[in-house]
């Protein structure tokens, strides 16, 4: 699995937390970081889209992270991840730049998901997606990390 993101995650607590979760995921969640583009908003989105899609093989199963995507709960994401993995295609999670994803990325994506209605810094989105993929794998393997219900 690969996470392809615009921007660099600097050393610090966000990177440490990302690495903590990414290191638990099997197969490993690797990262490709792409330099942010410059220009008008539309030009940035167009250039970022070309870079993001260019970092994915033609047969990639692309999961775009976008505020307009579906908002699965953890159990539903676990089902989705299982289905994606069963496809045999390499899974690529795409995170756009500050201006969001170009429509060409949304159109190419096999799935578009959102982490909710709140706006998250791009560096935290990396941590959140790594944790949720780890959680999904824990759910799918019966690991006790995820607790669906809590006693009253």
Swiss-Prot record:
Enzyme superclass (EC): transferase
Pfam families named among the record's database cross-references: SPOUT_MTase
Compartments, record wording: Cytoplasm
Record-linked HAMAP family: 23SrRNA_methyltr_H (MF_00658)
Domain of life of the native organism: Bacteria
InterPro entries according to UniProt: Alpha/beta_knot_MTases, RlmH-like, tRNA_m1G_MTases_N
Descriptive protein name: Ribosomal RNA large subunit methyltransferase H
Free-text function comment from the UniProt entry: Specifically methylates the pseudouridine at position 1915 (m3Psi1915) in 23S rRNA.
Main localisation: cytoplasm
Catalytic activity: pseudouridine(1915) in 23S rRNA + S-adenosyl-L-methionine = N(3)-methylpseudouridine(1915) in 23S rRNA + S-adenosyl-L-homocysteine + H(+)
Gene Ontology molecular function: any one: rRNA (pseudouridine-N3-)-methyltransferase activity
Swiss-Prot/TrEMBL keywords: Cytoplasm, Methyltransferase, rRNA processing, S-adenosyl-L-methionine, Transferase
The protein's assembly and partners: Homodimer.
Listed GO CC annotations: cytoplasm
EC number: 2.1.1.177
Ligand binding (S-adenosyl-L-methionine): 65, 96, 115-120
Family: Belongs to the RNA methyltransferase RlmH family.
